[in-house]
A protein has these predicted regions:
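ABC-family nucleotide-binding domains
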Residues: 2
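H-loop/switch region of ABC-family ATPase nucleotide-binding domains
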Residues: 28-29
């Protein structure tokens, strides 16, 4: 089923379950849908039932990777993101992003097998989980706190070692002055900025 019909079908099942007090048993391979629709999940490893519980009990850090034997790429249980392996090597590109603006760039760089660094990202930023999965280096900082000077200095050193800079942000928020300073620093160094 395509996304539209899958959502309609699952919505109808959920409605029937509530109205008619039905128990619905499904075999789902779309983990994100299983997490959203299921009250209880049974995980089967090969032919053996391995774990039974609520979505919160099943989707714990590292469990899905272990269950499926994921050794190439990664799966983040918190966001339900599956990502291909990160490129290896020294980063040649530094990405200044945040607020979800970098995810498409990270994936494009991964597809081209270009190692990259990114920062400074707050650990609750939309870009952070994808950055952790795909970037060679992620300069991050605690959520809801101002960026520390030491973190900015680490970002400047990493940026100075990269050949190209990509800035995904049209402007920066109040707590992102360090990223604005990082962009100015890149310009001072004469880096190629896209």
């Amino acid at each position: 089923l395509d996304v539209k019909y899958k959502l309609e079908f699952l919505s109808i099942l959920q409605e029937m379950k509530h109205q008619k007090k039905l128990t619905v048993i499904m075999s789902l391979h779309e983990l994100d849908l299983a997490e959203r629709i299921s009250d209880q999940i049974l995980c089967v490893n090969g032919t053996t039932p391995e774990r039974f519980g609520t979505p919160q009990e099943i989707f714990t850090k590292g469990y899905i990777s272990k269950l499926f034997g994921i050794s190439s790429g990664s799966f983040d249980e918190k966001t339900m993101n599956a990502e291909l392996p990160k490129p290896c090597g020294k980063p040649s590109v530094f990405v200044i992003s945040g607020d979800g603006t970098g995810r498409n760039i990270y994936r494009k760089l991964q597809r081209k097998n270009i190692p990259f660094a990114t920062g400074i990202l707050f650990e609750n930023d939309l870009d952070y989980p994808v950055a952790k999965a795909l970037a060679t280096e992620v300069i991050s900082t605690e959520s809801f706190e101002p960026i520390k000077g030491k973190t900015l200095e680490v970002a400047k050193v990493t940026l100075s070692e990269c050949d190209h800079i990509i800035c995904c942000r049209p402007h920066f928020g109040t707590f992102e002055k360090a990223n604005e300073e990082l962009l100015s620093y890149a310009k001072q160094l004469g880096k190629i900025i896209k």
